[in-house]
Amino acid sequence: MDNNNNQRGISFIGSIALLVSAMTGPGLVTIPLLFQISGWLIPTVMFLVAMSLGAISSLLLCEALTTVRGNDHFQRKIELTHLTNFLIPQKKTRLIIQIILYLSIESVIIASIILSSQAMDLMLLRWAGKTCGLSLHPNLGFLCVKDAIDGNSPFGSSYMLASLGFVIALGFCAPLAFLDLVDNMIVQILSFGTLAFIVIVWIGTFIITGLHKDYVPLIGSNQSQVVGTVLFNYAFVTTVPSWVNDLRPDVSIRKATWYSVIITTLAYILLGILGGMTYKMDLASNIIAEIDHSSHRNILTDIATFLFPLAVLLTSIPVYSIVVRYNLERSGLCKRKMAILLSTLLPWIIVLPFQSGFWLNIFTNWTTLLFTSASNFIIPFYLYNLSQKQKNQISSIEIIELAEKDFETSTLIITSSSASATPPPSVPPSSPMLNADKIDKKTLPNVDTKNIIEKATNIISNTTDNDNLLHPNRSLHYRSNRSNENINDNLIITPTSPTTPISPISPISPTLPILPSSPQYPSTPSTTFSQTKSFIAFPASRQCRMMVAMVAGIISIILVGGIIIYDFIKLALGSNEFDLSANS
């Protein structure tokens, strides 16, 4: 039964489908315009930089997760918000970061709901000839439109309570959001296959239509949109902890991560360069609009246009809802019912009166700018740095414990040997040697070394004795990433008792947890667990990984800080434009 549970995890193909889905969205159709106005050199370089930052941030975050005591192989299912409880002792700082993480993912869900609802209404308008909804302002009542109005929504500036597109999106996403992440993998794999079909059809259409090199210069006249448009397409890092917690044992985290970002980057660059060379686009245009008005429109392009909102936009909403629920529930912030309310129902309620107009778009853009950027490209590097510092703090505790164990072992050997040896000659009752022991006991303090070590450990790690106990009804799933194979192996071990400690040291532990005296399965060698290693971001020394984390973190801060400053300057100058991708 345990083996079946292991195989129920997310597969390698499912991992790629999940991560690619998190990195692709409505921004996919606007990339050719970016290459036309900015040239192909700087956007291509920025895509490579963003790809590297996203992958490094994800892998370092995974390594930080394994430093939590008892989570060496992701067996405790520690989520991102839960990780802050272990690494950040300051309550105010921890609360601020948790709020940023929550608002980041919620803003992505809200933006995706808006874009998906609008896309469904436009699809109905295209294929059914009209779409309808319940209007709140300026006219209260049922409203139907037959022609698309300029803007993102077919209803223009009218404020809608609900539209047919919203109902379709809700009916598709809500049932999937109540499932677990593993149960959504079939939908994600189908979405990935559909996305591949769409990209192939578009590229084929570009080639048939004809390419014009002069449409995409080496360096364009406007570079202001490059960083924001490219960087936020890789804002998938917040989904990584939930993914690795449900990962199957035979899946390599490194390979899945790098394959996903490389596939996504190639799709963006190919669509950007080839699409930009095919059509001369204005600032309000995109790939779908240009193909629809081209002479090479055919049944395949119509199918691709029909499937795009379904495969690319809708399928990401349940994933982010599940990630929010996991973070709230697994970290103990709230119970399951409240977690479902906050993750699945609340975003749809917030969106109801704001499906059209511009106020929610402004809110979404700024929350994406401030929260999504920090949670994906700054906080992961910060948490990794904290995890490595905590490792240094507990090294002295490990040395003390090792010395204590050696002392106890040597004492046991001496006691055993003395018990089997010839007893010493008896001492008369009046001998002063008998009183010496009493004198020593009075003069020497009664020191309990083990209690001192435990108290010191709790002080350093900011934990209590209750944190050292494993839940009695929970099994441990050990996943290792061998440096020579890059493959994770899971084995299941049930604690010997409800009070079996996870680790003798702090919540952040680079060593393996205490294991039962014998494995659960007789066929498993007794040396399996002593030979497994915790996951590391990439095969390099710890100093090298910390250096990479520092450099990548500095680059991320410079890029994100530059975008924020740039947009604040634009706002001060009276501009309502934002240097952001449409894909949150």
Locations of regions flagged by a protein language model:
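Membrane-interface "cap" regions at the ends of multi-pass membrane proteins
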Residues: 1-33, 54-59, 77, 400-416, ...
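Extracellular loop-to-transmembrane helix junctions
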Residues: 32-67, 71-74
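Membrane-interfacial loop- and helix-cap regions that link adjacent transmembrane helices
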Residues: 7-8, 13, 65-92, 97-101, ...
